[in-house]
Amino acid sequence: FRQGQESKIISYAHKINHGEHPSINSPLTEPQIWKDGTDCMFIDSGLGEHGKPNSEYPQWSSLRYGMDVVNMTKSLYIDIINKYHNTKDIQILIPMKISDLGTIRINDIIQEAVNPPAKGKSQIKLKDRTFRDGDKVIHTINNYDIEVFNGDIGWIQSIEEVSGTAEIKFGDDRVVKYKKIDMMELELAYAITCHKSQGSEFDCVILPIMSQYSRMLYRNLL
């Protein structure tokens, strides 16, 4: 694990690998950990019957504050993390692509929140997906013609709506010109699957764990 010697991520990961249950602090009950350098936190968005008054949920549950796991994820991505940590390199990791709470739906939710349609903002629609200026995207197959490969993540710098072309800037500061046919190889990347993230590094990761992912919830996922 590429972390500092005092990283909680390392100790928690070793416990999980050994089948032990780590005791991970929650910022809902210990808000000071947002500022004290703690690098791994756990926020519970379940436990208990839904539909109760917020005040009846435990203090450590996000439901007490009116936020289920999707809204909590959105709030963390858009607002809370940037409030305490100066980073834009935030990645949501999801075990599954296709489900009610898979990467496709979470990407649509985050895109609508951080990069909605606006007057003067170019966008292009390709089948069931819409890309806009400023969107975070991931290339999904190897494309040797433009030298972009499976798992490369970048940001759309500009879109030409008439021709269906775009310019995308990747992490190594390369700007690549995409034809419309190349755009078909892209997906939104606010949320990506854990599988797609292998080999990548991020300043901050949000990892929602929900019962809908039950067939993927094994120790080695964490």
Write out the residue ranges for each language-model feature:
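C-terminal accessory regions
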Residues: D152-L222
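Glycine-centered loop/turn motifs
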Residues: G134, N150-I153
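Hydrophobic alpha-helix feature that most strongly marks membrane-spanning transmembrane helices
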Residues: Q111, N115, N142, E161, ...
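Flexible loop/turn segments at secondary-structure boundaries
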Residues: Q3-Q5, S99-G102, D145-E147, V162-T165, ...
